[in-house]
Design a protein with these regions (language model features):
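Stable alpha-helical elements in mature extracytoplasmic
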Residues: 143-146, 165, 169, 196, ...
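Secreted/periplasmic carbohydrate-active enzymes, especially glycoside hydrolases
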Residues: 1-162, 172, 177-180, 203, ...
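Short, solvent-exposed turn/loop segments enriched in Gly/Ser/Thr/Pro and often Arg
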Residues: 101-106, 125-129, 159-172, 184-188, ...
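Short low-complexity, flexible loop/linker segments enriched in glycine and/or proline
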Residues: 172-176, 195-200, 204, 283-284, ...
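Acidic (Asp/Glu)-rich catalytic clusters
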Residues: 120, 170-176, 207-215, 280-283, ...
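Acidic-and-aromatic substrate-binding clefts and catalytic sites of carbohydrate-active enzymes
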Residues: 158-166, 189-198, 274-277, 296-307
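Substrate-binding clefts and catalytic carboxylate motifs of secreted carbohydrate-active enzymes
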Residues: 8, 17-21, 216-221, 227-230, ...
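Compositionally biased, intrinsically disordered or flexible polar/acidic segments
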Residues: 504-625
Length: 625
């Protein structure tokens, strides 16, 4: 088929099998409907098929002039109705309807991705088919809801990972306008197993044949991080070499199969951040390459992200690239004023993605990116702060958006005003108060408007200019509840309103810095030893403070070094309270007035040493009653 702004044709092909005991005289008609429902064109042909035989047909329309092009912004669909009749009686024997769209695209190592002849940045999301408590058995409406949520955020591209998903998902991609990468599940390692190659071939052919009519699909994928586990498990050359040879042979074979099935779309693989894929020859097989990059999460630092991309581009300038995965985990119970990698705080995920997204948007040779993942999803082998959950999602498992969702919405939705106080994930706050002075805590706003004014309990805190779709105010907290409101002038002409507003109520618990001169009767001081994060328990709403060094008249640790672990803590839902410690601590001191106090200790053995006695207060010789 051929398509341009001036004209386009539709190629219709298929098979008809005559299961009857006598020959069949048939009439096959194809009717093409414009997006508005009017008939654009029809084709008829007479067919004669002998008993038990199969007939393959192939018909191409004459040019349809000035076709309405399919894009994520204007997903115009043409309907192709195929009707099979008995030629003599005109009885309808079979009938089918398929939707298609007119669009063309290209990938280029220097210019990135183009759609219908124009540069187009792929703003994407990876998506697993999963939701608590039903697992992968989502209903059609759940699939449709996910695409609606992605579109509302401003996404135009989805990586359907790592396996073909329900037809309802692709139908919604076609209808609402979402470009798609679909792939078959080949991961971890290519085994020396009889029938493995044939099974992979069959999976690839089935996926393409089932879904090739969808105009949303632009690339077919196979293999995800195929060398990651291979290189971890096999270090010796004599062990690694045959596996790499099998992997390369399988990739070459699948590329041939893919091109046999579909020459109108491009092929791709997703690599983890290792140049080994290029060194062994995998990088030159597919039309485009995807990079799964996590600099600043699984090691390294944030700026390593753009450095890696630049290195790859310099070495292989003709390779079109997509960043097929990037992301950081977040647990809404964890918050930090000094976030760092792998603390699972909401704030570090925001910091990470606020660094990555501008790189993707501003680097012309990058075709686009797909954030990993759209949802918090089940992951059987994970421990971390939320066992069995990969929590890198932009929305929670129940599809409630995290605050970071609105950063993407502010960046990607230039057609509407976006203003969101990014504190829905941190509504119970706490802080150390010096005397009667208010506690200053940051409040962030995501917006695509140039300037924001913030109010606390009706009092203006002034205005700030937006930078990277975010504004952060230092807000004074001093009472149990505050109402925070944001206001911005609407510069988006699409909506006839002068100002955009958002508001939220935040709870606050002050903790006195000077314990010695304070009435502590109602004080509940909870400390997460060794942690830099605030932790609010789902079960009690109690907020545990980050650890701090001892100060006179206050409280804190004496000596030791902060350590952490990501192992699952059993028999509790408050795992993050037990995953940090101070190794070699000399003491913990509270300068409190004379009186009677209740002290609770929470213990676990994160080093799995199974010590018989972890701690017994009565055995310490320096205990003072």
């Amino acid at each position: 088929p051929k398509v341009s702004e001036e004209k386009g044709t539709i190629l219709i092909r298929g098979d008809i099998k005559n299961d009857a005991t006598q020959k069949a005289l048939l009439e096959l008609e194809h009717i093409i409907y414009h997006p508005n429902g009017s008939i654009a064109q029809s084709l008829k042909q007479s067919i004669q098929i002998k008993a038990g035989e199969q007939y393959s047909f192939r018909s191409e329309t004459s040019p349809i002039l000035s076709p309405q092009l399919w894009t994520p912004e204007t997903p115009h669909l043409y309907r192709v109705e195929s009707i099979l009749r008995d030629k003599k009686t005109k009885t309808v024997l079979d009938q089918s309807n398929h939707y298609t769209g007119f669009r063309w695209f290209s990938f280029d190592g220097e210019r990135g991705f183009s759609l219908n002849g124009k540069p187009y940045k792929l703003r994407g999301i990876c998506r697993h088919q999963d939701q608590k408590p039903i697992g992968v058995a989502l209903t059609d409406e759940m699939h449709r809801r996910d695409i609606k949520l992605m579109k509302e955020m401003g996404a135009n591209f989805i990586r359907i990972s790592h396996y073909p998903q329900d037809d309802a998902l692709l139908e919604m991609c076609d209808k609402l306008g979402m470009l798609a990468w679909e792939e078959i599940p080949i991961i971890d390692i290519v085994p020396d197993t009889p029938g493995y190659t044939e099974n992979c071939e069959r999976n690839l052919r089935e996926m393409i044949r089932q879904h090739y009519n969808h105009p949303s699909i632009i690339t077919w994928g196979y293999m995800n991080e195929i060398l990651l586990v291979t290189q971890r498990l096999y270090k010796k050359e004599e062990e690694l070499k045959p596996i790499l040879e099998r992997t390369l042979a399988l990739a070459n074979r699948l590329e041939v199969v893919l091109k046999e099935e579909d020459t109108t779309r491009v092929s791709t693989m997703a690599f983890h951040g290792s140049n080994s894929y290029n060194e062994v020859g995998l990088g030159s097989i597919t039309d485009i390459v995807g990079w799964n990059l996590y600099q600043g999460w699984y090691g390294g630092n944030l700026t390593g992200f753009e450095q890696y991309l630049e290195e790859q581009h310099k070495k292989y300038p003709s390779h079109p690239m997509i960043v097929s995965e990037y992301g950081a985990g977040s647990d809404k119970r964890l918050h930090s004023l000094q976030p760092h990698a792998f603390d699972f705080s909401i704030e570090y995920q925001q910091k990470y993605l606020e660094h990555y997204l501008p790189v993707l948007e501003e680097t012309s040779y990058i075709c686009g990116g797909t954030h990993w993942n759209f949802i918090d999803f089940s992951s059987a082998l994970r421990d971390e702060s939320m066992p069995r959950i990969n929590n890198k999602g932009l929305v929670y498992s129940n599809r409630t958006p995290k605050d970071i969702y609105y950063y993407y919405k502010a960046a990607w939705r230039q057609d509407i005003p976006v203003l969101h106080i990014a504190s829905r994930d941190w509504t119970h706050r706490s802080g150390i108060q010096h005397g009667k002075e208010p506690v200053i805590l940051p409040v962030k706003i995501y917006t695509n408007l140039p300037e924001v004014e913030l109010f606390i309990d009706g009092k203006s805190l002034g205005k700030q200019k937006t930078k990277n779709f975010a504004v952060t105010f230092e807000v004074p907290f001093c009472q149990k509840e505050h109402f925070i409101a944001a206001k911005a002038e609407n510069r988006k002409a699409v909506q006839d309103i002068s100002f955009v507003e958002d508001g939220i109520r935040l709870n606050f618990t002050p903790i006195p810095a000077n314990l010695n001169g304070t009435n502590l009767r109602d004080l509940e001081l909870a400390i997460n030893v060794g942690s830099y994060c605030f932790y609010t328990s789902d079960e009690s709403n109690l907020t545990w403070l980050p650890d701090q060094p001892y100060t006179e008249n206050g409280w804190g640790y004496i000596g030791g070094e902060s350590k952490s672990s990501q192992i699952q803590i059993k028999n509790t839902n408050d795992g993050p309270l037990f995953q940090t410690l101070r190794n070699g601590i000399e003491g913990y001191r509270f300068d409190v007035p004379n009186g009677v106090y209740e002290i609770e200790f929470l213990f676990t053995d994160i080093f799995r040493e199974n010590a018989t006695t972890v701690y017994q207060l009565g055995r310490n010789s320096d205990v003072e009653n």
